[in-house]
Amino acid sequence: MTARPNKTRERILTVSLAMFNEQGEPNVTTNHIADELEISPGNLYYHFRNKDDIVEHLFERYEAQMDQAMLAPEDRAPELEDIWLQLHLVFECIWEYRFLYRDLVDLLLRSRKLKMRFARILKRAHESIVEVCQGLVETGVLKASRVEIEALAYNIAMATTFWLNFEQIRPQLTTRTEPELGRGIYQVMMLLAPFLRDGERQHLNHLAEDYLR
């Protein structure tokens, strides 16, 4: 028999995520979370030891979602659209857990465990990008050496990781809405353009036009 999810625990995680995203994790205390939920701090501490415990549980969910987003196709050769889809899923995950990226350095300095787990995610992202790009080379979509693919994967991972922080310092774009994720995805995809064969570069341009409408 499957155990029922604990509603209070789920509410704490849901509300914490919303507050962290809106206000920034350093600006939210467990008392703030308890007040928002209209529960006592003692009730919150029954489910989570402290705020860092809440952050770790949210990170677990982020990590699982990110792992799913980075899965490469297994039963066929990769296509250009696969990278686009992967990036879309990754950017959606980044947006859903955006507090992790906004406060990334602070969080990783505070927790060695999170630092190690985030490093694993970056390693997994690099490997996934290399795998898909190598497949695109084999099918004639990309023209790039192994060294170029490694550098491309590094640049894609770096741009994706810090895209949200970059956007936040642009004065004209201080209000973020989910449809604007398309702009970030487009910028990352343009890193591929110099390595695409002519026909595939036109294909990328058509994909971009459809996506940014």
Specify the residue positions occupied by each region the protein language model found.
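Secondary-structure edge/capping motif, primarily at the C-terminal ends of alpha-helices
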Residues: M70-P73, Y101-L108, L136, G140, ...
